[in-house]
Amino acid sequence: MTTTPNTPLPNSLQKPLERFYEFLRSEKGLSLHTQRNYKQQLETMAHHLAEMGLKDWSQVDAGWVRQLAGKGMREGMKASSLATRLSSLRSFFDFLILRGEMLANPAKGVSAPRKKRPLPKNLDVDEVNQLLEVNEDDPLAVRDRAMMELMYGAGLRLAELVSVDVRDVQLRSGELRVIGKGDKERKVPFSGMATEWVGKWLRVRGDLAAPGEPALFVSKLGTRISHRSVQKRMAEWGQKQSVASHISPHKLRHSFATHMLESSNNLRAVQELLGHENISTTQIYTHLDFQHLAQAYDQAHPRARKRNDDKSD
């Protein structure tokens, strides 16, 4: 029998759903929007269940749930929507277990595939140099140049850059104390150009910073600069310096990681510099464009030069 959303479900499937909806309303206190989402997803799955000839929720096993997830993927369902579907199903089965109507939750071990987030395109070295050719005496321009030099020179996250205090910077040794994710502290070196421009900024910082303000980088109001202000200023400098790519703080960090890996090929060192807990996170930065790979191959492979030299007549 083929069912549609307008086809009445058998009581053995519909009644447990109605009890669950009442449970969501009276005991869980979920918003109407969430309740509607759960109902929509569960009704859809109940009709799939009926189409497959199953007459009771207790007949559902992990294989059926995986089949349902696969069907959603093949139909182009978004990862977030599939995650909502599986979440509602897990909650429903937990409810049936509490009522003694099921022994185990068949959806517990099934998860939606994670949506791969595309990494931003990194800047090439020429673009970075073009961006960092800011050479103005205005205190805000000096601050912005120092921020960009430090972010690219030390591979900082935006939150890390904003949270840096004056006391965290050791100009003589070129060392920076950083508080990263999970409040984990690390010390990182930074570039000579970052040292130069942070030093210039410190000489004019007192003209802007409010008394007692510990932040290294401050706004026009004299307080710690905000994440949004950093993003806005970097984007503006990208346009002003005629850099083709849109400039963002993460793109500078990404460029730092890519350029360091291209130059050193030391994944473990870059992991430490970036503050990644797992090296698998750092490995996403190892993508190199084909041109770079081809150049590296031609320079390193013993047969490559001969191949290039042996041109056919």
From Swiss-Prot:
PROSITE patterns for the chain: CB, TYR_RECOMBINASE
InterPro entries assigned to the protein according to its UniProt record, in alphabetical order: CB, DNA_brk_join_enz, Integrase-like_cat_sf, Integrase_catalytic, Integrase_recombinase_N, Integrase_SAM-like_N, Recomb_XerC, Tyrosine_recombinase_XerC/XerD
Assigned protein family: Belongs to the 'phage' integrase family. XerC subfamily.
Domain (Tyr recombinase): residue spans on this chain: 118-298
A GO CC annotation given for this chain: cytoplasm
Domain Core-binding (CB): from-to ranges: 11-97
Subunit composition and interactions: Forms a cyclic heterotetrameric complex composed of two molecules of XerC and two molecules of XerD.
Places the protein is found: Cytoplasm
Active-site residues (renumbered): R157, K181, H250, R253, H276, Y285
HAMAP family, per the entry: Recomb_XerC_XerD
Protein keywords: Cell cycle, Cell division, Chromosome partition, Cytoplasm, DNA integration, DNA recombination, DNA-binding
Gene that encodes it: xerC
Protein name: Tyrosine recombinase XerC
Function in brief: Site-specific tyrosine recombinase, which acts by catalyzing the cutting and rejoining of the recombining DNA molecules. The XerC-XerD complex is essential to convert dimers of the bacterial chromosome into monomers to permit their segregation at cell division. It also contributes to the segregational stability of plasmids.
Organism: Vibrio campbellii (strain ATCC BAA-1116)
GO BP: any one term: DNA transposition
Lineage top rank: taxon: Bacteria
One MF term in the entry's GO annotations: DNA binding
